[in-house]
Amino acid sequence: HLVNSPRTGSAFHVFDDFPVENIKRIEIIRGPGSAVYGENAFSAVINIITFDAKDIDGIKISGGYGSFDTEEGNIVFGKTYGEIDISGMARYRHTDGFDGIVERDLVTQIDTALAPLGFSPASQAPGRVDDWREEYDLNLKVAYKGFYVEGLYINKNMGPFISPQFALADESNIEQNYVFGEVGYKKTFDEKFTIRPRLYYDQFEWNNYVEALPEGAHVPLDTDGDGKTDKIN
């Protein structure tokens, strides 16, 4: 399934935190691969191969804690019951992110300019950048005699680090969702020829709410274009 987001062309928005505990191997195929992997595979292809039931044969549980109150837990499982293979993973990760302090921001400058006019300050500086992140990953695959059903769901929520107006604000949330589902059949003949008909669905979704300025901030406006402030909003 597609790793690169069709919106940005990059894999670093959704898969930058993909759990390595669920990766069996990484394939790097150099050179053009458009005939097999689509029109964008004109220089190389990187395939991420995840574990199947026979690779795991049980349950692996891992977790960690680190700087900036970073915590995560990961479960990888796989088992064969007769001719039925079941495998998957569940993972949670949260971090407060970099705790850098912004001493002054755009709203600080506006507050300074408007203070003689009696406007109350609204800047949240000095304050921390908004670099938190929270992620859920779920994957499940069931296979029987070459037939299989598989699904993946990734949900990310994060802060923007700082607002697009270079001001501290505390109500922003950048949410990214990725989901795929697939039903198919795979048959290999003498390890040289494989047939794999399949039906699949991929969806990338962005739900962003970015607070440009903190509550109570005032914006000087030049409504008539003469270079002078004539309105404060």
What are these regions (language model features)?
Residues 13, 41-43, 64, 70-72, ...:
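Transmembrane beta-barrel architecture of outer-membrane proteins
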Residues 25, 30, 45, 60-62, ...:
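Membrane-embedded beta-strand positions in outer-membrane beta-barrel channels/transporters
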Residues 2-5, 33-36, 95:
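Short beta-strands and strand-coil junctions in structured, solvent-facing domains, enriched
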Residues 12-16, 28, 40-64, 71-77:
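N-terminal periplasmic accessory domains that precede
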Residues 8, 55, 64, 76-173, ...:
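Periplasmic-side early beta-strands and strand-to-turn transitions of outer-membrane beta-barrels
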Residues 141-157, 176-233:
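Face-selective signature of the C-terminal outer-membrane beta-barrel domain
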Residues 2-30:
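Short acidic/polar hinge/loop motifs at secondary-structure boundaries
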